[in-house]
Amino acid sequence: MRTRIPAVLLAIAVVSLAVLAQTGGPAPATARSQDETVSLGYMHTVLYAQRVFKKKYGHYATSLAALVHTGSFTRRMANTDRGAYTVHFHGKPTDYSLSLIPKEFAPDRRAFYADETGKIRVEEDKPATAESPLLK
């Protein structure tokens, strides 16, 4: 029985690392609030779903609805009202952009932007764009 415990722990660690690798990992520790953590998790889910979609179909999804059932993207996630944030998605077969803009800017609610590069950009007091600083 004791010889099984290290093997089980190793298996759990391997599976956990595999899941993190597939999902892009947890939201960055730089989130300033739960709202930001949820929003960054949503962005990572969309970025991952777009990578999977492109690998499968040879182009990016042109709408959030097209991503449903790709990766872990659900039908409910296609709704652009994300609580404290509003989602703006612009998709073409060759590229896409995703913005999450807080309904009310605050020190713990910044705006985020990402595109097909997979890099997340941030702004403190205005909507983030492709020219905004990278999230660190």
Q: Where do the protein language model's features map onto the residues?
A:
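Bacterial N-terminal signal peptides
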Residues: 8-18
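Bacterial N-terminal signal peptides that target proteins for export
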Residues: 1-9
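Extracellular/periplasmic head regions of type IV pilus-like filament subunits
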Residues: 25-34, 41, 45-109, 114-117, ...
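Boundary of Sec targeting at the N-terminus
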Residues: 21-22
